[in-house]
Amino acid sequence: NASYWTKLAAKGTDGTDVGTTITTQGDILYRDGSGLQRLGAGTSGYFLKTQGTGANPVWAESSGGVIQTKYFIRNSSFTQSTSSFTDLGDFSLSITPTSTSNKIKLSVFFGAIDSAGNTSAFVYTRNGSQVGIGNAEGNRARASFTIQGTSYTASNHAEGTSHTFIDDPQTTSAITYKIQSATESGSLLYVNRPRDDGNVSDIYYSRTTSTFIAQEIVA
């Protein structure tokens, strides 16, 4: 209650004046071998680490793990046709890294996708620039990953696919990631549905969901 805090802040009868020990927003109050001490606010993204009995706490950088996760989910189906890389629907998300040394793990999963027996290629973009693509070799196209359209003679089948890439943006500024696609001969790409769109209950006509995820991870 207020009366007890007033007494603590005014050092009670023989304590240290808390008001003169912690002076800045974000300060942490702790006791060392002689009395109360101030630990100033740490670097953004760092955590408070105990060093055990007889040692003072410190701010420390995480040695691994996920710092934050952003995701985009597409539950509806759509089609797209282009022979050159173009943004794939609304597959887009933004993330702001907390450290320039951290990486961004990009993951995409398409519940069902087909391109009428033709190959489709996909790339990730970071603020409009392609990332995570294969090395240049002659005149060959470069992509993050590709799929081949289903080879079923019946067009009511489609398969899911997934891909993961680790990006190294080396920034603490906001980043927008997107997925782009291109299809062989500009054929139609079907997302979250098969080519044949029969309105029946057979599972091969299933509508599916697709997900795009960005996770900041400590390298």
Please identify what each model-predicted range represents.
Residues 1-65, 100:
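Extracellular repetitive beta-rich solenoid segments
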Residues 65-74:
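Extracellular receptor-binding modules and their adjoining Ser/Thr/Gly/Asp/Asn-rich linkers
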Residues 91-95:
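Extended, low-complexity regulatory regions
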Residues 25, 44, 68, 157-159, ...:
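A generic structural signal for well-ordered coil/turn residues at beta-strand boundaries
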Residues 87-89:
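Short, solvent-exposed loop/turn segments enriched in Ser/Thr/Gly
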Residues 18-22, 77, 151:
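Membrane-targeting and insertion segments and their boundary/processing signals
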Residues 72-73, 79-84, 96-174, 178-219:
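Terminal beta-strand-rich extracellular "head" domains
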